[in-house]
């Protein structure tokens, strides 16, 4: 396929080589200027941040109202395209992306929506895990991903800050992090949960909470998560 990739952020940086490796002809376009945007392609992929999506779509579709456009956002409905183009859909790769570390796209779950068969064909050319999903269900999928990825990584950052404050290296946590992730491949997360909160060891919880008294925001997070873990364990 001839694919126009609009955007040069983290996702687009990973999409470009994945599309090329799958054998597609790719034109990469800067979303801020749209300079050199072709008038025709098999599919236009809009891979920009959610807050810029509507503006980019409104500009990119001008004169291309019969072209196929897809966006890559997990929490934005497909209906955003209505009134801009007659052929549209969603191509949502559910993964955490960084410019510095390219992922193996063949293992990335891709969730598609839309009537045009080219959308699924594009996804299947790049990934072994392709699923049809409506906008209504996709917003809950994205929400669940925020808990599983973004919040988990934030806890890593909090752990790193705490260790640094006391002169300890973060890499001592890596075996623990790796084993925690491996366990949920074979166990339900509730069954994999360990630590003082799951058994509600009040003495340990109270002591650890007190250690955070000089950082009330972190103490609040600790107390809230401990209570949530305890309630889920009951």
Indicate residue ranges for each PLM-predicted region.
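Hydrophobic anchor at the start of a short beta-strand
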Residues: 3, 26-27, 67, 88, ...
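NAD(P)+-binding Rossmann beta1-loop-alpha1 motif at the extreme N-terminus of oxidoreductases
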Residues: 1-37
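Internal alpha-helical scaffold of NAD(P)-dependent oxidoreductase catalytic cores
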Residues: 15, 22-25, 102-185
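Structural signal for conserved beta-strand scaffold positions within catalytic alpha/beta enzyme cores
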Residues: 28, 71, 89-90, 111-112, ...
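Rossmann-like NAD(P)(H) cofactor-binding subdomain of soluble oxidoreductases
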Residues: 16-20, 32-102
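Interdomain hinge/lid region at the active-site interface
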Residues: 180-234
């Amino acid at each position: 396929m001839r694919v126009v990739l609009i955007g040069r952020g983290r996702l687009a940086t990973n999409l470009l080589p994945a599309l090329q490796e799958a054998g597609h002809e790719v034109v990469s376009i800067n979303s801020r200027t749209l300079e050199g945007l072709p008038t025709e392609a098999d599919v236009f992929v809009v891979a920009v941040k959610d807050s810029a999506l509507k503006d980019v779509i409104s500009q990119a579709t001008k004169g291309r109202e019969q072209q196929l456009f897809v966006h890559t956002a997990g929490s934005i409905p497909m209906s955003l395209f209505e009134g801009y183009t007659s052929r549209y859909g969603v191509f949502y790769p559910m993964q955490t992306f960084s410019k510095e570390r390219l992922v193996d796209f063949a293992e990335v779950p891709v969730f598609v929506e839309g009537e045009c068969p080219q959308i699924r064909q594009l996804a299947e050319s790049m990934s072994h895990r392709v699923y049809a999903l409506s906008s209504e269900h996709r917003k809950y999928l994205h929400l669940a991903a925020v808990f599983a990825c973004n919040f988990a990584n934030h806890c890593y950052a909090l752990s790193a800050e705490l260790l640094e404050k006391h002169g300890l290296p973060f890499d001592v946590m890596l075996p623990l992090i790796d084993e925690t992730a491996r366990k949920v491949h074979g166990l339900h997360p509730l069954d994999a949960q360990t630590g003082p909160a799951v058994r509600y060891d009040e003495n340990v919880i109270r002591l650890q909470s007190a250690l955070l008294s000089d950082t009330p925001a972190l103490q609040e997070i600790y107390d809230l998560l401990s209570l949530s873990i305890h309630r889920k364990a009951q």
